[in-house]
Amino acid sequence: MVRFILSRLLMALPTIAFVSITVFALIRFIPGDPAALMLGDMAQPEQIEAMRTELGLDKSMPQQFLIWAGNVVQGDFGRSIVNDEAVLPLVVSRFLVSAEIVVVAVLLASLIAVPAGVIAAWKQNSLTDLALVGTATLLLSIPTFWLGLLLLLFFGLKLGWLPVLGYVSIGDNLVGGMLYLVLPVMTLVIHEMGVLIRMARASTLEVLRLDYITHARAKGLSESAVLWRHAFKNAFGPTWTMIGLILGNLLGGIAVIETVFTIPGLGRLMVDSIFARDYPVIQGCLLFVSLSYVLVNLFVDLLYPLFDPRVVAE
């Protein structure tokens, strides 16, 4: 087990290095001069050149990368060009907002969709199976931004049951924070349920065809015992991987939901920074999203042996 964990950690290091180089390179190739942007339109060429020297932009790309990577390791992501705010605290505060929404949404979607997918597999080709698969297909076909607007108009504006726009932290106000979370979380849950129902159904069907399931049935075990005690654990492995992928994808792609509901999360910060050409903040957001995706998948890999111990042996 220790060897398995070490191998996964070592495999993550090249990925993190590649992500860092890619983020650094992407920002450097964006049109525009950060020094000129910081000084404004009235700046003289001499002032711009002095600012480029101060920012280290006059150095070669490899030198710039080493300086930037060294600063990042020390927790220095630079300062925002727009408001001169330190990038790391800004990105972390916005990331926590996004993470709160995404984690709650993925947890709820998993609790509903995984049992539904297992039941659909158990009742294969029945009316229940057809209804669940049809529902999953329908949920997958709905664009998230359209669904978010629909829920906002119906529950927020027409019925007036829930706050329409904005965000309140659960830590500051438990009840108010939960009310503000309902609509964005519901939007994500409805969409991701479609993916998880289909994945749980497919993996469960595959396991139910294995010999040890036939043996368990031959021993006289009830169908519910065969399903939940013997089939579910092995069937959950691929679904667990999909949950990790969904979690990572949502952390990087929640900008649409945050824009619809005006939530001050990481996705909206990235969009605003792109329009403002705030390069240090864009770079910090991209790096944070990329690293969170890598770490989420590393976490998924490390827990996978709980569902399939054969992974460690292999």
Question: How does the language model describe each region?
Answer:
Residues V2-R3, L13, P89, F95-D129, ...:
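Alpha-helical transmembrane segments of integral membrane proteins
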Residues L6-I16:
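N-terminal signal-anchor/signal peptide hydrophobic helix marking the start
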Residues S7, G40, T53, V82-N83, ...:
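Phosphate-coordinating loops and pocket residues in cytosolic domains that bind phosphorylated ligands
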Residues T15-L66, L159-Y180:
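Hydrophobic alpha-helical transmembrane segments of membrane transport/permease proteins
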Residues V19, A36-M38, Q63, G78-I81, ...:
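Short, hydrophobic secondary-structure boundary micro-motifs
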Residues T22-F29, K59, G70, G134-L165, ...:
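Membrane-water interface segments at the C-terminal ends of transmembrane alpha-helices
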Residues L26, I30, M38, M42-A43, ...:
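Hydrophobic aliphatic residues
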Residues D58-V114:
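An internal, D/E-rich "acidic patch" concept
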